[in-house]
């Protein structure tokens, strides 16, 4: 093998090129790669953080929806309870009013019965007096007396 000066010159040039590359070219490349790596890592962590925030937001939305559903169901139940209470109150008032009307009607009917009895007593008394007058005006005869009683029965 023949070592000549060209080979040494090429080695020197290669070493200078390697030194120049390591001194001036390699650090910016390493810095660029490090920055890119850092940006990728930051992007991945931001993506994971965003994903976690999205999941948390979904959980909050689900909780708020569940709360809203529960509130709605509670309001419906309360409204139904109030409706039942109002219906019961109206029913009780209607029953009380019906009882009052029935009691008033019974009292009115009783008054009318009493009034009719008083009127009937007056008429019976008048008829008895009239019958007694007629009996006393005539002479006491069994046949006439029986006829007058039959007449009075017919009038009653």
From Swiss-Prot:
Keyword Cell inner membrane appears in the UniProt entry: yes
Compartments it resides in: Cell inner membrane
Cell inner membrane found in the keyword field: yes
Transmembrane intervals: 7-27
Entry membrane topology: Single-pass membrane protein
Main localization, broad class: membrane
UniProtKB keywords: ATP synthesis, Cell inner membrane, Cell membrane, CF(0), Hydrogen ion transport, Ion transport, Membrane, Transmembrane, Transmembrane helix, Transport
Cross-referenced InterPro entries: ATP_synth_B-like_membr_sf (IPR028987), ATP_synth_b/b'su_bac/chlpt (IPR002146), ATP_synth_F0_bsu_bac (IPR005864), ATP_synthase_B_chain (IPR050059)
GO molecular function: proton-transporting ATP synthase activity, rotational mechanism; proton-transporting ATPase activity, rotational mechanism
A Pfam family of this chain: ATP-synt_B
Single GO cellular component term: proton-transporting ATP synthase complex
SUPFAM superfamilies, A to Z: F1F0 ATP synthase subunit B, membrane domain (SSF81573)
Similarity section: Belongs to the ATPase B chain family.
Subunit architecture: F-type ATPases have 2 components, F(1) - the catalytic core - and F(0) - the membrane proton channel. F(1) has five subunits: alpha(3), beta(3), gamma(1), delta(1), epsilon(1). F(0) has three main subunits: a(1), b(2) and c(10-14). The alpha and beta chains form an alternating ring which encloses part of the gamma chain. F(1) is attached to F(0) by a central stalk formed by the gamma and epsilon chains, while a peripheral stalk is formed by the delta and b chains.
Function: F(1)F(0) ATP synthase produces ATP from ADP in the presence of a proton or sodium gradient. F-type ATPases consist of two structural domains, F(1) containing the extramembraneous catalytic core and F(0) containing the membrane proton channel, linked together by a central stalk and a peripheral stalk. During catalysis, ATP synthesis in the catalytic domain of F(1) is coupled via a rotary mechanism of the central stalk subunits to proton translocation. Component of the F(0) channel, it forms part of the peripheral stalk, linking F(1) to F(0).
Protein name as catalogued: ATP synthase subunit b
Phylogenetic lineage: Bacteria, Pseudomonadati, Pseudomonadota, Betaproteobacteria, Burkholderiales
Gene: atpF
């Amino acid at each position: 093998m023949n070592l000549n000066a060209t080979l040494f010159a090429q080695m020197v040039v290669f070493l200078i090129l390697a030194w120049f590359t390591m001194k001036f070219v390699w650090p910016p490349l390493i810095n660029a790669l490090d920055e890119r790596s850092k940006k990728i890592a930051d992007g991945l962590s931001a993506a994971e953080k965003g994903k976690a925030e999205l999941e948390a937001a979904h959980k909050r939305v689900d909780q708020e929806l569940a709360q809203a559903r529960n509130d709605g169901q509670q309001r419906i139940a309360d409204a139904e309870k109030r409706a039942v209470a109002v219906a019961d109150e109206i029913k009780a008032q209607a029953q009380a009013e019906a009882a009052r009307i029935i009691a008033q009607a019974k009292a009115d009917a009783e008054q009318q019965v009493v009034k009719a009895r008083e009127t009937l007593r007056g008429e019976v008394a008048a008829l008895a007096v009239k019958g007694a007058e007629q009996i006393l005006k005539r002479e006491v005869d069994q046949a006439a007396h029986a006829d007058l009683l039959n007449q009075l029965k017919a009038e009653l």
